[in-house]
């Protein structure tokens, strides 16, 4: 819906055309007749810059899905904020959440989806990680940015002065983590691109505006 140009006040004329004037049958115009694009045709529902950001974000998510071989891009900000956010540095597969029952109670752990893709066979050898450790890793990365506040703020200000609307938007989102002192899944989803985990335990946290933190 938000991909429709009407939301930013523009109009694309002759999306369809009449093929039978007696029955008034119309079909989609796939280049058979000329189309006309009119800017500022009417009062926009969404301002032009926000509309453009939405289109860029849709394209980014599509590219993200293709790069990480995901069927869907899912954002469960509160109940499961790490969905489609954690990836294996060894095989590239996404990590999935598992609920383990132990003598100490239930544990939420994440492991590579290629670990047991074929029943009874061990695939990827990467280790699992507790969800609590993922939260701590994100907060540790945030702490690194807070520690180098002046440097990252200078980077964000430079991005805000640039022409890339999406990076300008991401940079503005990043300021909210400068005073973050506890994990918040909603905020994390607004600033995090992904987390990668290697077999030797190295964690790389990549933020949407391009900053990488190696832990």
Identify the function of each model-found stretch.
Residues 1-136, 142-170, 183, 191-215:
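Conserved catalytic breakage-reunion loop centered on the nucleophilic residue
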Residues 173-177:
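Short, hydrophobic/π-rich interface segment
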């Amino acid at each position: 819906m938000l991909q429709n140009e009407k939301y930013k006040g523009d109009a694309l004329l002759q999306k369809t055309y009449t093929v039978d004037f007696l029955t008034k049958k119309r079909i989609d115009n796939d280049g058979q007749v000329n189309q006309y694009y009119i800017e500022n045709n009417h009062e926009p529902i969404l301002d032009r810059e926000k509309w453009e950001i939405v289109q860029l974000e849709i394209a980014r998510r599509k590219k993200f899905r293709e790069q990480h071989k995901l069927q869907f891009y899912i954002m469960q900000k509160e109940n499961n904020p790490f969905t489609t956010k954690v990836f294996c540095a060894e095989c590239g597969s996404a990590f999935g959440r598992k609920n383990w029952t132990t003598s100490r109670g239930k544990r939420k752990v994440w492991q590579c989806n290629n670990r047991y893709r074929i029943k009874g066979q061990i695939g990827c050898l990467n280790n699992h990680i507790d969800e609590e450790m993922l939260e701590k890793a994100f907060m540790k990365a945030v702490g690194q940015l807070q520690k180098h506040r002046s440097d990252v703020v200078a980077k964000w200000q430079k991005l805000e002065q640039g022409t890339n609307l999406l990076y300008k938007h991401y940079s503005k989102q990043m300021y909210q983590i400068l005073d973050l002192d506890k994990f918040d899944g909603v905020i994390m989803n607004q600033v995090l691109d992904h987390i990668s985990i290697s077999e030797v335990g190295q964690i790389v946290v990549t933020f949407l505006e391009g900053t990488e933190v190696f832990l």
